[in-house]
Amino acid sequence: MPAITDPHIGFVSFQEALRAGTIRPAPCASHPELYVLHDTPEPGTQRLTYAFVTDSLAKAYAVYVLAEPLNGRPCFGVGYATDAEYRGQGLATDLVKASMAELEKSLAPKLLSPGFYVEAIVGADNAASKKVATRTLSETPKSTKDKESGHPALQYVKLLGC
């Protein structure tokens, strides 16, 4: 059985591309270290990657992709990771909060009707990610199974833009 998707794998690739200069995230007006990169990793998949960047180093990142609608509203799945050197400092929590505010600011005016969800599916055994999701999305997650791996997971959901 495969493992639950690990956002840290994508973070390593993002970090390498940032250092090599093959990607150029744009600065966000809301936070001096917050940058965003919009890309299409595969046909039909739009991805927004937010990162706290200093010089050519990403300290933490959060990736948003469109997921299945929830309660008739758009839903974005979020995954996040922090560079090993910066873990335990609250950066992932700060980044998820800052990136959700930026996403809400840019997306809300474009929606046909108000409101969209952000969802994190977190492995039941991932204590660090559960803390971040509890602090940023919901204090009352729903027990579920990860669709890809079948492993026990928790679903954290937050409604934005209303």
Which residues make up each language-model segment?
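Conserved active-site alpha-helix within GNAT-family acetyltransferase domains
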Residues: 117-142
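Conserved acetyl-CoA-binding loop-helix of GNAT-fold acetyltransferases
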Residues: 88-105, 131, 135
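C-terminal "cap" of GNAT-fold acetyltransferases
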Residues: 145-162
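Conserved GNAT acetyl-CoA-binding A-motif
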Residues: 105-121
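Acetyl-CoA-dependent GNAT
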Residues: 14-73
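A short, internal acetyl-CoA/4′-phosphopantetheine-binding micro-motif in the GNAT/acyltransferase core
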Residues: 79-91
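Residues on conserved beta-strands of the protein kinase catalytic domain
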Residues: 74-76, 152
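A short beta-loop-alpha structural element at the N-terminal edge
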Residues: 1-20
